[in-house]
C-alpha cells in the first residue's frame, strides 16, 4: 500500500527564511516539502529555482528533507541537470509544458531523482497513459497552477480515482485548495500525497493540521477498497 505523505507547500512560507521554514515543517511532522518552481511563462508568477533549492539542501541532507519540486515552467527538460545537482528529490514536470515526456522521465531517473507528471485541471488523465507506468508519481492539480490560496476544485477528483484504481502502487498527489475541510474528498478518491500551503503555514497549530491531513488519508486507506 502506498504511504500517506503530507507535503507543505513552501510557496505559503516566509521566503526570507526558507531554511527555517523547512526546519519548522520537519519538526511539525511533514513528510515532504513541496517546492513550486515558476518561470512567469508557463504560469504568470515567478518564484524560485535551482539556486534556492541548493541553498536549502545545504542545510538538510536528502535523508532529512525530501524536496518535491513542482516545475511550472516551459521546457522543463532544461532544468533536469540543474535541479539534480541542487539536490531535488523528485522532479515533477507538467504534461502541458513539453513534448518530451519520456525523455524527461528517463533523464531525471538517470540523475537519481524520482519523477512525477502534473496535470492541469482541464487536462484529461488519459494523456499520460502511454508512459504512466514509468512515473513515480502523478500530480493532479485541484486549482489552476501558478498561485497559492485558491479554492479547491472537486471536479478534478475523478482523475485521482481513475489512477488509484488502475495503478494501486502509484503515488497520487493533489495540490490546490487542500485543507482539513477539503482533504477527505481527495483522500477518499485515492490521493496519498497531500500538498497544503496556506492551510498549514497560516494555521495556529501547523502540527495539528499536518496530523489531521495524514489521518484523513490513513482513514481512507482503511475504508476504501481501492487502497487494498
Curated annotation (Swiss-Prot):
Amino acids binding a divalent metal cation: 34, 36, 70, 175
List of residues binding substrate: 9, 70, 146-149, 175-177, 197-198
Presence of the UniProt keyword Manganese in the record: yes
Details of cofactor binding: Binds 1 divalent metal cation per subunit. Active with Co(2+), Fe(2+), Mn(2+) and Zn(2+).
InterPro entries named in the record: Aldolase_TIM, Ribul_P_3_epim, Ribul_P_3_epim-like, RibuloseP-bd_barrel
Active site: 36 (proton acceptor), 175 (proton donor)
GO cellular component: cytosol; nucleus
EC number: 5.1.3.1
Enzyme category, top tier: isomerase
Source species, domain of life: Eukaryota
Cofactor(s) listed in the protein's UniProt record: Co(2+); Fe(2+); Mn(2+); Zn(2+)
Pathway(s) this gene product operates in, as recorded in its UniProt entry: Carbohydrate degradation; pentose phosphate pathway; D-xylulose 5-phosphate from D-ribulose 5-phosphate (non-oxidative stage): step 1/1
GO biological process: carbohydrate metabolic process; pentose-phosphate shunt, non-oxidative branch
Catalyzed reaction equations: D-ribulose 5-phosphate = D-xylulose 5-phosphate
Gene Ontology MF term list: D-ribulose-phosphate 3-epimerase activity; metal ion binding
Protein family membership: Belongs to the ribulose-phosphate 3-epimerase family.
Function of the molecule: Catalyzes the reversible epimerization of D-ribulose 5-phosphate to D-xylulose 5-phosphate.
NCBIfam families: PRK05581.1-4 (NF004076), rpe (TIGR01163)
Protein name listed in UniProt: Ribulose-phosphate 3-epimerase
Native species: Schizosaccharomyces pombe (strain 972 / ATCC 24843) (Fission yeast)
Taxon lineage: Eukaryota, Fungi, Dikarya, Ascomycota, Taphrinomycotina
Amino acid at each position: 500500500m502506498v504511504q500517506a505523505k503530507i507535503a507543505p507547500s513552501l510557496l505559503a512560507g516566509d521566503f526570507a527564511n526558507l531554511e527555517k521554514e523547512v526546519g519548522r515543517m520537519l519538526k511539525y511532522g511533514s513528510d515532504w516539502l513541496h517546492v513550486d518552481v515558476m518561470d512567469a511563462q508557463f504560469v504568470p508568477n515567478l518564484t524560485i529555482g535551482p539556486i534556492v533549492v541548493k541553498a536549502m539542501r545545504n542545510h538538510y541532507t536528502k535523508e532529512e528533507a525530501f524536496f518535491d519540486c513542482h516545475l511550472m515552467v516551459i521546457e522543463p527538460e532544461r532544468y533536469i541537470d540543474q535541479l539534480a545537482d541542487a539536490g531535488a528529490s523528485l522532479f515533477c514536470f507538467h504534461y502541458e509544458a513539453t513534448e518530451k515526456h519520456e525523455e524527461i522521465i528517463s533523464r531525471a531517473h538517470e540523475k537519481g531523482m524520482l519523477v512525477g507528471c502534473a496535470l492541469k485541471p482541464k487536462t484529461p488523465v488519459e494523456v499520460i497513459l502511454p508512459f504512466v507506468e514509468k512515473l513515480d508519481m502523478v500530480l493532479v492539480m485541484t486549482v489552476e497552477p501558478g498561485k497559492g490560496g485558491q479554492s479547491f476544485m472537486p471536479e478534478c477528483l475523478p482523475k485521482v480515482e481513475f489512477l488509484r484504481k488502475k495503478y494501486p502502487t502509484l503515488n497520487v498527489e493533489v495540490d490546490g485548495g487542500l485543507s482539513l475541510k477539503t482533504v477527505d474528498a481527495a483522500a477518499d478518491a485515492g490521493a496519498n500525497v497531500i500538498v497544503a500551503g496556506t492551510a498549514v503555514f497560516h494555521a495556529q497549530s501547523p502540527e495539528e493540521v499536518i496530523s489531521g491531513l495524514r489521518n484523513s488519508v490513513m482513514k481512507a486507506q482503511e475504508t476504501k477498497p481501492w487502497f487494498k
